[in-house]
């Protein structure tokens, strides 16, 4: 039967094939490569080793709570948010220790589009380790050193190599980087 394509129906989306994480995975890899390019350009370091540190479980919980609060209540009032967070047993220690971290996370969240924020709310958990591991070959290719040593650690890893304590600067979707 010969039919014109213009008379055919549009294809339908198969939601089971769609991953909420895919856009964040790709953006995480792109941002990591871009950040490393900036660091090497400014410092004029030729990287031999690159260490990437992902945020702790507590920081991820804090991020999720901030994201929910900002999206549901449409407010990012730092004082109001801090009062709530210091009473949350799950995250109060990190909040009291580092109010600047809370401020930076709020800025991170507000810098993203509403669509990105809404998608991230729907994601139960986002593991930065998997896309970062997948991005190592792209990073090596970009730098032009296929033998470049790249290690990825969680901030919580007790055996991580972190001579400058860079891991403490990691935030969800914003891994910390150390280059030798």
Which residue stretches match the model-derived regions?
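Acidic, turn-prone loop/beta-hairpin segments
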Residues: 1-34, 53-56
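Short secondary-structure boundary/capping segments
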Residues: 1-4, 65-74
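Ordered, soluble secondary-structure elements with a strong preference for glycine-centered loop motifs
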Residues: 23-27, 63-65, 126-130
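Short glycine-rich, basic-tinged beta-strand/loop micro-motifs
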Residues: 43-69, 100-103, 109-122
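C-terminal edge-of-domain segments
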Residues: 79-180
């Amino acid at each position: 039967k010969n039919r014109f394509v213009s008379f055919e129906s549009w294809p339908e989306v198969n939601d089971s094939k769609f991953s909420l994480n895919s856009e964040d995975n790709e953006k995480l890899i792109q941002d990591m490569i871009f950040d490393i390019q900036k660091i090497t350009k400014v410092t004029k370091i030729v990287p031999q080793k690159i260490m990437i540190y992902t945020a702790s479980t507590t920081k991820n919980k804090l991020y999720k709570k901030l994201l929910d609060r900002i999206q549901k209540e449409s407010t990012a009032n730092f004082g109001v948010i801090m009062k709530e967070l210091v009473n949350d047993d799950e995250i109060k220690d990190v909040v009291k220790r580092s109010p600047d971290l809370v401020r930076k996370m709020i800025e991170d969240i507000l810098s993203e589009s509403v669509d990105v924020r809404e998608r991230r709310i729907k994601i139960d958990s986002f593991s930065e380790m998997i896309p970062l591991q997948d991005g190592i070959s792209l990073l090596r290719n970009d730098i032009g050193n296929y033998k470049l040593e790249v290690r990825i650690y969680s901030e919580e890893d007790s055996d991580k190599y972190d001579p400058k304590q860079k891991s403490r600067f990691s935030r969800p979707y914003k891994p910390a980087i150390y280059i030798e």
